[in-house]
Amino acid sequence: MQNFIFISPNFPTNYWQFCRELKNNGLNVLGIGDQPYEELKPELKASLNEYYKVNSLENYDEVYRAVAFFISKYGRIDWLESNNEYWLERDAMLRTDFHITSGFQVSDMPRIKFKSKMKEYYQKVGIATARYHMVDNFDGCKAFISEVGYPVIVKPDNGVGASHTYKLSSDDDLRHFLIVKELEVSYIMEEFIHAEVNSYDAIINSKGEPIFETGNVSPISIMDIVNNDDNSVYYIVKDLHDDVRKAGRATVKSFGVRSRFVHFEFFRLTEDQPSMGKKGDVVALEVNMRPCGGFSPDMMNFANSTDVYKIWADMIAYDSTLMPQGEHAFCAFAGRRDGKHFVYSHEQLMQKYQGNMRMVDRIPDALSGAMGNQMYVATFPTCLLYTSPSPRDR
């Protein structure tokens, strides 16, 4: 029996389903988290063979001791994963320290966590990347801006989501950023790309081959949602575009991905941009070596009439899957921000789209910055072109 340690199986709240499918496939599923056992969902408790509670997952020594305890009790650990961006480096440290070879090691982290390091691997397979400059001082940044022009995007070179991301449109913006930026954080400055975000989401086997593929489109960037306190909108595509599939598969090979659920983000240019390409071209944004966040795995299920939790667990247990896919549809997510005025009330939305709704819930505070406060997930056979609402209706 294979031993699988799942870090933070209780959060995100839908991740217990990964554990359920691992256990259904005969693995010994061992959880490590900082939530008291008695507060875990009954479904999660039933999906774990054992749970080790630590005071804080931020405390490496505590988590290290938890892994050591499981090894002393169950023997060699075959897998250790969180499927969570926040813990990717922690996962790699634990694998390296305990010689768990089924996933990324500490030495792999730079190319998959640092945005500046990713560019080399995109370029190896002919995928265009934005020009960039590592933030130093005003004069250095201005020299770069003189080449690419305003606006520019500035974000942590190693960052999660859109936190501490800035759009600078003037010298005054640049001066302000240089004053307020965190001194201990390394920032990357990139030329602004006129585009929408298209993703490649896939479950990859040990040979670097996809056993499941889909993708999403984000008409509003996460940066704008977070910085403008806006509503969140994105959707899972009914069928993955061939150019996104091609770029995604090339990226898998270039980055040496094995045995993972991945979420790769690309820009699709909305206008010609001489430094990047023609309108409609797919160019690089960043790689994320984990599933798309929030309720996206459930949305993938709705869009493809399948179960990605099981497909992922099948990849772990068998390196393949027999899980079928049924009828495809578009699956849309709308996250509404509390305190804003909307044309339709909650009750009116539920009445109008009752036949389409798949999930309706409040969003946990930890995710609300990028996703809004009230979420709706619905499926549709067709997709109308999204247009940004007026400020009144946002």
Predicted feature residues:
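Well-ordered mid-protein domain cores that form the structural environment of catalytic cofactors
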Residues: L88-D97, S107-Q123
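Short beta-strand-to-loop capping motifs
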Residues: S169, R336-D338, V377-C383
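ATP-dependent carboxylate/phosphate-activation module, predominantly the ATP-grasp catalytic core
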Residues: E191-V257, F261, R268, D272, ...
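Polybasic (Lys/Arg-rich)
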Residues: Q354-L385
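Conserved small/polar residues in nucleotide/adenosyl-binding loops
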Residues: Y386-D393
